[in-house]
Amino acid sequence: MWLNSTSLGACFRPVNITLQERRAIASPWFAASFCALGLGSNLLALSVLAGARPGAGPRSSFLALLCGLVLTDFLGLLVTGAVVASQHAALLDWRATDPGCRLCHFMGAAMVFFGLCPLLLGAAMAAERFVGITRPFSRPAATSRRAWATVGLVWVGAGTLGLLPLLGLGRYSVQYPGSWCFLTLGAERGDVAFGLMFALLGSVSVGLSLLLNTVSVATLCRVYHAREATQRPRDCEVEMMVQLVGIMVVATVCWMPLLVFILQTLLQTLPVMSPSGQLLRTTERQLLIYLRVATWNQILDPWVYILFRRSVLRRLHPRFTSQLQAVSLHSPPTQAMLSGP
């Protein structure tokens, strides 16, 4: 345990920052501007989604999952951004604003929840498209209701994991420079176990998305380029895969550096945290940088949908419409071709 004043909660540990540094970087405007950019991007995507015609079948299911992803990103930026901006306004003095650590525990759980949800939803979307493209007749028809049930399951799963430190497995602590709370990169078994659970679950989600999307794209390409093919994928099939691949690339670039850093830090032989709870200065700064990179995932996700819609793709590539007409992959002749040698 860390040595703290008895009047303070258990989330406080020594942080490598002086009062002068704290005052120099304690500007709420950067945090507020960053949050406003993300909120505006997600609101724009939600408005575009609201005006989309989902129809029925795979597209309605995909749009429901995508709406769940954008809504999650919006709420994540709203909740965590408000806390970060308030702490910057308080000159990063978390002890003065939250001595009992209630806000810190709330933000730590929110960081885990809103961090894992996009990765899990990305994997769920990849699985939905994988089954829809490669095995369209092996499952019940995709519906938006089933998709929203999947979103609900992801929320419950991520929320349950985020509550574990409040139940005794792992700890949330104030992180450098004092504007946010996150899981503790300590050497205690609970900290290591919880950190590994978070990083491994996120990494597996990204890896699963990569695998399933690769197979789905390869299947679409095989159908499109097959010489004997008389039918082509509909443009909506290609549109959904382009958007899904874009979401996967954004999640990989934004989140994998942080997840790998957490794994390396927790598994290395020499602990990076002293018995008093102080992290190495380089470790604290690296964690902050990787966290900021990961936050861009919530800002870029909505732009993947906004920019990779059919209407935009047609303007960028006029042949997109003429090349990708015809019936869906879900017709029996196409399925026979997909299941062929």
From Swiss-Prot:
PANTHER family: G-PROTEIN COUPLED RECEPTOR FAMILY 1 MEMBER (PTHR11866), THROMBOXANE A2 RECEPTOR (PTHR11866:SF5). It is found in: Cell membrane. The keyword Transmembrane applies. The chain crosses the membrane at residues 30-52, 66-86, 106-127, 148-170, 192-217, 245-268, 288-309. Interacts with RPGRIP1L. Interacts with RACK1; the interaction regulates TBXA2R cell surface expression. One of its GO terms (molecular function) is thromboxane receptor activity. Disulfide bonds join 104-181. The keyword Transmembrane helix applies. Gene3D superfamilies: Rhodopsin 7-helix transmembrane proteins (1.20.1070.10). The modification Phosphoserine is found at residue 328. It comes from the Eukaryota. Residues 53-65, 128-147, 218-244, 310-341 are cytoplasmic. Residues 1-29, 87-105, 171-191, 269-287 are extracellular. GO terms for cellular component: acrosomal vesicle; nuclear speck; plasma membrane. In the brain, expressed in all types of glial cells. In the kidney, expressed in the mesangial cells of the glomerulus, smooth muscle cells of the renal arterioles, and in transitional cell epithelium of renal pelvis. This is Thromboxane A2 receptor. Belongs to the G-protein coupled receptor 1 family. Keywords: Cell membrane, Disulfide bond, G-protein coupled receptor, Glycoprotein, Membrane, Phosphoprotein, Receptor, Transducer, Transmembrane, Transmembrane helix. Receptor for thromboxane A2 (TXA2), a potent stimulator of platelet aggregation. The activity of this receptor is mediated by a G-protein that activates a phosphatidylinositol-calcium second messenger system. In the kidney, the binding of TXA2 to glomerular TP receptors causes intense vasoconstriction. Activates phospholipase C and adenylyl cyclase. One of its GO terms (biological process) is response to lipopolysaccharide. Glycans are attached at residues 4, 16. It is a multi-pass membrane protein.
